[in-house]
Amino acid sequence: MAPPPSLAPDRGGGEPDDALRLRARAAAAAGDAPAPQQQQEQRHQEQQQQLLWYRASAPAHRRVRESPLSSDAIFRQSHAGLLNLCIVVLVAVNSRLIIENLMKYGLLIRAGFWFSGTSLADWPLLMCCLTLPTFPLAALMVEKLAQRKLISKHVVILLHIVITTSVLVYPVVVILKCDSAVLSGFVLMFLASIIWLKLVSFAHTNYDIRMLSKSIEKGVTHDISIDPENIKWPTFKRLSYFMLAPTLCYQPSYPRTTYIRKGWVVRQLIKCLVFTGLMGFIIEQYINPIVKNSKHPLKGNFLNAIERVLKLSVPTLYVWLCMFYCFFHLWLNILAELLCFGDREFYKDWWNAKTVEEYWRMWNMPVHKWVIRHIYFPCIRNGFSKGVAILISFLVSAAFHELCVAVPCHIFKFWAFIGIMFQIPLVFLTKYLQDKFNNTMVGNMIFWFFFSILGQPMCVLLYYHDVMNRQQAQTNR
């Protein structure tokens, strides 16, 4: 067996082995094959040469080389083996923690926190949820009146403002009037927020379609290529499809697939159920015991608060990743498959985000497209600077995060609002660090630390203790 080329000494004035082999192959290709005697002589020479390769006097070090983990060579190496090691260690450590938790606490699955004893009797929330589709129908009626020019442009805008405002105020009033479970209120506010975003897009897009139609009638198109499929008037069928489709941006037509993969849908539904159960297990077995044994992070000892936040960071990260996979990958793709919705870019590789700004652009594509289309670029077109447009976008996002969390919890401490607005300085900080150090890893690590290790566990502790304090105060009355 031939040694590595680095251990083979120079042959002096002789011809290298590689050259001999190349000459032999070239001669064979040309039809001038060596005679058997020549082949035997060649093999004998190779055997004699191999004896020299393993002599003690043969040099073992022949060139300058870096260690694989040195700073100059580490990024040129493949670390697949280390990644496999990390996965094995992660599985082993988490398996031990699960077994230890079950041996210490037993199975803690309960539904009291999510579904109270009155959850099935929360008929006001159920009735509110069932009546939410009336708001899209009202928006369609407004567009029909505008299409027939029975109402003016300003009246159309006013009616859409009334409809979109009502679709948020109505569920908020119902939830605050009823002492419902947290999960029931969250689901209702989540649906109401989605309908609000869709109706704003519906109204804004149709307003722009009317403006484009008037420009076409006048022969003024501003040199913009207009697809006739995207300037059609709204119909009940188009609105119904839009309200069910996994998108927040209205348009008269969407890219469609040709058929439904029924077996694929069943597999995704099974995965969705499995990961939903996993989320519930982590919450009940890990997150609830940790927060129960903690104090309010703003009232207790600082070191104890840091210890609780760090202990809570891993399970909350797992729950958040499961939630992302269940909703953005499984559920939205299931909806897209059932509706033959073609554009399924619901997220990008946000885990590789180099800055906080990149993360917000990549992790939730339906909301990102909505913000770009209906907030950011309209602000730019109206003369606002880029920084002001970003600030307004974050304000809207922070307001909806606060609504979806604070209203179901019946607590208005603005923790979610502050958490989202705190992302603005992080946007500029990570952008500055990336430009200063020309290193993509710095911003990525800052994003993971503030978002997953510090931000989410802190919000969980703050809201949990506020909810528990509110429930305790109600019990003492």
From Swiss-Prot:
Active site: H401
Primary location class: endoplasmic reticulum
Catalytic activity: an acyl-CoA + a 1,2-diacyl-sn-glycerol = a triacyl-sn-glycerol + CoA
Transmembrane segments: 79-99, 123-143, 155-175, 182-202, 230-250, 263-283, 319-339, 387-407, 409-429, 442-462
EC number: 2.3.1.20
Record's subcellular location: Endoplasmic reticulum membrane
Skewed-composition ranges (Low complexity): 25-40
GO cellular component, one term: endoplasmic reticulum membrane
One Gene Ontology biological process: triglyceride biosynthetic process
First and last residue of the signal peptide: none
Sequence motif FYXDWWN motif, location on chain: 346-352
Membrane topology field: Multi-pass membrane protein
Pfam families hit by this protein: MBOAT
Amino acid composition bias (Basic and acidic residues), ranges on this chain: 12-21
Pathway assigned in UniProt: Glycerolipid metabolism; triacylglycerol biosynthesis
Source organism superkingdom: Eukaryota
Keyword entries, A-Z: Acyltransferase, Endoplasmic reticulum, Glycerol metabolism, Lipid biosynthesis, Lipid metabolism, Membrane, Transferase, Transmembrane, Transmembrane helix
InterPro entries listed in its UniProt record: Diacylglycerol_acylTrfase1, MBOAT_fam, Oat_ACAT_DAG_ARE
Top EC class, one word: transferase
Primary role: Involved in triacylglycerol (TAG) synthesis. Catalyzes the acylation of the sn-3 hydroxy group of sn-1,2-diacylglycerol using acyl-CoA.
Sequence similarity: Belongs to the membrane-bound acyltransferase family. Sterol o-acyltransferase subfamily.
Annotated protein name in UniProt: Diacylglycerol O-acyltransferase 1-2
Source species of the chain: Oryza sativa subsp. japonica (Rice)
Gene: DGAT1-2
